[in-house]
Regions:
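Conserved Nudix-box catalytic region and its N-terminal flanking loop in Nudix hydrolases
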Residues: 18-58, 192-194
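Catalytic beta/alpha-barrel core
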Residues: 134-137, 146-158, 163-246, 257-259
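Conserved N-terminal beta-strand and adjoining loop/helix that marks the start
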Residues: 1-20, 71
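Glycine-rich phosphate-binding active-site loops on the catalytic face of alpha/beta enzymes
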Residues: 218-224, 257-269, 295-317
Length: 317
């Protein structure tokens, strides 16, 4: 006998790097657990219409612009669930209208919350390791496994081993050889790998879903239109100014790399943001911002003081 199926619209509401979370009552399915806002898609509703309605009814705010995030299928013992996920940033003017008991949590705090099993893949996508190693040499991916590990994250039961290790951005212009090399990686290494969209689009679909994130250069970001980001995979934008940072927000990116913060040997002639300008940009972001340029792994606390979520580096990582 087949299980009943339920289609649910789920909203990931973002503000200054935090995510809105609520609590499921004991009498609800999967009760006494945390939840993201949302609810059942009614007959005649599209998923995004249901998302918009549920957020107005449950949270108390009306948001029109939503970005498709993913569709997740999960089977419980008694029911088959399809989660249609969307994400949106919340304007500061709406904060006072948000109804209790909805609460803002940092990405790190999400790891310690008790969510239904169907939400675990959402948590893994929302949480980013705080370090990104950048290299043109893919062989460094394996050597970099234990060089920088978020010690706190390793203690979290909801975080798998790969997520607890630094991410690795394979930066290369050699597309053909890059595609061949990436296809030789195992799933563990793919789960830490960030590659540019030009490489990613040439991979088989199974490998496209396995990578940690898809990278877009600033010009690629500026050339995109709303709705063109791929579904079901994290996307990270390279930004060098406020215009591109704001563009990344409007397009629905998951995170950004903001650079250069300090002078670097690889880009000696580039205009450096400096910490104060970086802080101004990062503090205005609702997405995780990685600081890049002249930083070492030990600079994480400094970068976070100026509004960064994490740091990225080349020669010093």
């Amino acid at each position: 006998m087949s299980k009943p199926s339920v289609h649910v619209a789920i909203a990931l509401l973002l503000f200054r790097g935090k995510v809105l979370v609520g609590w499921r009552n004991a009498d609800q399915h999967q009760g006494n657990k945390c939840e993201f806002p949302g609810g059942k898609i009614e007959a005649g509703e599209t998923p995004v219409e249901a998302c918009r309605r549920e957020i107005f009814e449950e949270v108390g705010i009306g948001i029109q612009q939503w970005h498709a995030f993913d569709v997740i299928h999960h089977e419980y013992d008694d029911v088959e669930v399809f989660l249609h996920l969307f994400h949106a940033t919340v304007n500061e003017q709406y904060l006072a209208d948000i109804q209790k008991p909805w609460t803002w949590y940092s990405r790190d705090q999400l790891l310690g919350l008790n969510f239904p099993k169907a939400n675990h893949s959402i948590i893994q996508r929302l949480f980013w390791n705080h370090h990104i190693k950048i290299s043109e040499n893919l062989s460094e991916l394996c050597r970099n496994k234990q060089s920088v590990v978020n010690a706190n994250a390793l203690n979290e039961s909801n975080l798998n081993e790969a997520s607890a290790q630094p991410l690795f951005y394979y930066r290369t212009e050699l597309l053909t050889s890059a595609v061949e090399q990436v296809q030789q990686l195992n799933l563990h290494d793919l789960s830490r790998l960030i590659i540019n969209v030009d490489i990613w689009t040439q991979l088989p679909e199974s490998l496209q879903k396995a990578v940690a994130a898809v990278h877009y250069k600033q010009q690629q970001v500026m050339d995109l239109q709303i709705g063109q980001l791929p579904l079901g995979v994290r996307c990270i934008a390279a930004c060098h100014d406020l215009v591109s940072l704001q563009r990344a927000h409007s397009l629905g990116f998951d995170a950004v790399i903001l650079s250069p913060v300090l002078p670097t040997a690889t880009h000696p002639d580039a205009h450096n943001l400096g910490w104060e300008q970086f802080k101004q940009y990062a503090k205005s972001s609702d997405l995780p911002v990685f600081a890049l340029g002249g930083l070492s792994p030990t600079d994480l606390s400094i970068a976070q003081h100026y509004g960064a979520y994490g740091i990225a580096g080349i020669s010093q990582f």
